[in-house]
Every structure is written in C-alpha cells, then in structure tokens.
Amino acid sequence: MKQLLIALVILTTTACGWHLRGITKLPATVQVMTLESQANTRFTERLKQQLIFNGVVFPSDASANVRLMIAPIHIERLTLSVNSRGQAAEYELNAELKVRLIQLEEGTDTEWNLSGRRIFSNDINSVIATQSEEKVQRQELENDLIRKLMNRLKKAQLK
C-alpha cells in the first residue's frame, strides 16, 4: 500500500509539470558551448554552475558551435522615497544584462537584454544593516538574471 501511494504521488507531481526550481531542460543545440563573460567573477561562476547543472558541456578546445557572450552587469541604485527629514527611506536597484548567443557555423546571432528590479528599505539607524541588505538584494538580482537567461536559452530557436 505504501509503495502504491508513493507511486501515485510521483505520477501526480510529474503529470502536473512540477519540477525542482533551477532545473531547466535546455535544447540540444545549446548543450555544448563556450562561455565568454565580462561580468563579475561571482556571477560568472554561478552562471557556469547553473549551466553545468542543466547539462551544458564546456569543451576545453574551441570545438563548440555555440558561444554565449555575457557583457558586464550594470546595476544602478536609485533613491525611491525619502522620509520627513529628507533622508532616503527606500532604494531601488535596477539591473541590466546584455547577452549574445552566437551560432558560429550557421552565422546566427541572437541578442537579449535582460533586466531586473529590487526594492529595499534604508534603516537610517543602522548603516551596516542597510549595506548588508543591499548586498543580499544585489545577489538575488543576479540570481534573477541567471534564471531569466536560463529561460531564454530554453526557448532559443537555433538550427
């Protein structure tokens, strides 16, 4: 009976399309690629780790037909609101990432502009807490950009 219940739960979750977060089935055309990134090292390593986790292989030679080029991430911090004393009460982080997916043999070049936005409060009594929160929000913003890029790669129409 217990085995039947486990089998039923597994069938139900797979039939409804549920899957673990971060797992993206990428098309075969992007399973072997080279990665050229001008983004910061932390972002590049997390992106590479996510790609490897989803089955992408990075050959040591130049044999890959697909090249993924990542421009530097541009993150801008804006004051969103101020308190009654004229001090910043909330900040907004806006991120933009330019990505190019090039298929060398076919000569196709696809460019994407990915963006993200985060809002966080400014604790005027604790500068360290605000700096810590900004750091966390920047990391989450980068994670959002990686997820968006993985979704774009999933839907990439390459030959």
Feature map (PLM): residue ranges:
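C-terminal motif of bacterial Sec signal peptides marking the signal peptidase cleavage site
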Residues: 12-15
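Solvent-exposed, acidic/flexible segments
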Residues: 40, 44, 90-94, 134-142, ...
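Surface-exposed short loop/turn segments
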Residues: 54, 69-113, 118-131, 135
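N-terminal segment of the mature soluble domain
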Residues: 29-74
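Bacterial signal peptide processing site
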Residues: 17-20
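C-terminal/domain-edge helix-coil "capping" segments
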Residues: 128-159
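Positively charged n-region of N-terminal signal peptides that target proteins for export
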Residues: 1-5
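Sec/Tat-exported extracytoplasmic proteins
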Residues: 51, 55, 101, 105, ...
